[in-house]
């Protein structure tokens, strides 16, 4: 590796080669970290729900392989993301100890790792299920790794809005793995995750604003300010609440899901309202250390998990 510095927006981030910053051999845990297992768990869950609510059936072994392919593809995208974002990861407090900026894994190794896993996951999905599921999986990898990571993330404060599509594909993939088609129901599941993503990540970005600003990432709080971000969180939560009840309103689900969607959405609206009404200084910065934003972020995780679980329960009761 050369001694040249990483540069982000013309600003020097580090003048030392990565291996000199923290020399050492990578552990198995480092290679797992590249796969972003926390993100993977939620993606695998929504993909599994997509399979469970789909009409028809898939052999349990093939179903397990399909879920594994979704997990591996998600991990591959995470590895490619960490390879590309190694410069900004090095200056953000919550990411500076990741394997690449910490010097435990070489960038080229991470990229190769991600590409091999990506290609392998798509090929195995094709062989185990069908071409539709494999094609959507391939596009999801491309969307996250290229469109979001390499283009949107550093170019627009709407990066999360558009890039949220990448995380919304798994239930569609799960459905397609069983049916070989894409119908209205998986599209609505896609829409739920798509509109859930902005309030989820903007809540995080409010209390991690300084990190994003230091790294030069144009997240909405950095570009438009905290006050505008709170307004956007509220607006997208309203949209999400409407979309979440659509499967019930259109008769595609029963009361279990419908009541769950209503109650959970009311809870999310309350959380977002608290974010909107958070005590602020004259420039819109929180006087409570963004406690409401932290609470909304945590609630959003519960919201999506329970909502999708209700879809599966509703299917079998």
From Swiss-Prot:
The record's catalysed reaction(s) read: heme b + (2E,6E)-farnesyl diphosphate + H2O = Fe(II)-heme o + diphosphate
Please name every pair of cysteines joined by a disulfide bond in this record.
none
- Catalytic class of the enzyme: transferase
Membrane topology note:
Multi-pass membrane protein
CDD domains reported for this sequence: PT_UbiA_Cox10
Location in or out of the cell: Cell inner membrane
Q: Which Pfam families match?
A: UbiA (PF01040)
Molecular function GO terms recorded: protoheme IX farnesyltransferase activity
Enzyme Commission (EC) number: 2.5.1.141
* Keywords tagged on the record: Cell inner membrane, Cell membrane, Heme biosynthesis, Membrane, Transferase, Transmembrane, Transmembrane helix
Membrane spanning residue stretches: 39-58, 62-84, 100-120, 123-143, 160-180, 184-204, 233-253, 256-276, 293-313
Q: Name a biological process GO annotation.
A: heme O biosynthetic process
This protein's source sits in the domain of life called Bacteria
Q: What is its main location?
A: membrane
Keyword RNA-binding attached: no
Name the pathway it acts in. Porphyrin-containing compound metabolism; heme O biosynthesis; heme O from protoheme: step 1/1
Name one cellular component (GO) term: plasma membrane
What is noted besides the main data?
Carbon 2 of the heme B porphyrin ring is defined according to the Fischer nomenclature.
Q: What does this protein do?
A: Converts heme B (protoheme IX) to heme O by substitution of the vinyl group on carbon 2 of heme B porphyrin ring with a hydroxyethyl farnesyl side group.
Similarity section: Belongs to the UbiA prenyltransferase family. Protoheme IX farnesyltransferase subfamily.
Q: What is this protein called?
A: Protoheme IX farnesyltransferase
């Amino acid at each position: 590796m050369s001694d040249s510095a990483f540069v982000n927006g013309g600003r020097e981030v580090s003048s030392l080669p990565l291996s000199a910053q923290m020399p050492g051999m990578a552990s198995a845990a480092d290679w797992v970290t590249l796969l972003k297992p926390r993100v993977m768990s939620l993606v695998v869950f929504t993909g599994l729900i997509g399979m469970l609510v789909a009409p028809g059936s898939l052999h349990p072994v093939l179903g397990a392989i399909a879920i594994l392919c979704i997990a591996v593809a998600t991990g591959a995208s995470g590895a490619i993301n960490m390879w590309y974002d190694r410069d900004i990861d090095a200056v953000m407090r919550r990411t500076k100890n990741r394997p690449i900026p910490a010097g435990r894994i070489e960038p080229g190794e991470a990229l190769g790792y991600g590409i091999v896993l990506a290609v392998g996951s798509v090929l195995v999905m094709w062989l185990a299920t069908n071409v539709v599921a494999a094609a959507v999986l391939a596009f999801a990898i491309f969307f996250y790794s290229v469109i979001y990571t390499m283009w949107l993330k550093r170019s627009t404060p709407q990066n999360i809005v558009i890039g949220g599509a990448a995380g919304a594909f798994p239930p569609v993939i799960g459905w397609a793995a069983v049916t070989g088609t894409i119908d209205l129901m998986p599209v609505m599941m896609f829409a739920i995750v798509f509109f859930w993503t902005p309030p989820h990540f903007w809540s995080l970005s409010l209390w991690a604003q300084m990190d994003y600003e230091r790294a030069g990432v144009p997240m909405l709080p950095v570009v438009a300010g905290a006050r505008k971000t709170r307004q956007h969180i509220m607006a997208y939560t309203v949209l999400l609440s409407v979309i979440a009840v659509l499967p019930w309103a259109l008769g595609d689900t029963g009361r279990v899901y419908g009541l769950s969607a209503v109650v959970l959405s009311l809870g999310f609206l309350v959380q977002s309202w608290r974010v909107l009404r958070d005590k602020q200084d004259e420039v819109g910065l929180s006087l409570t250390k963004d406690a409401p934003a932290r609470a909304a972020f945590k609630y959003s995780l519960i919201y999506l998990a329970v909502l999708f679980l209700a879809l599966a329960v509703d299917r079998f009761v």
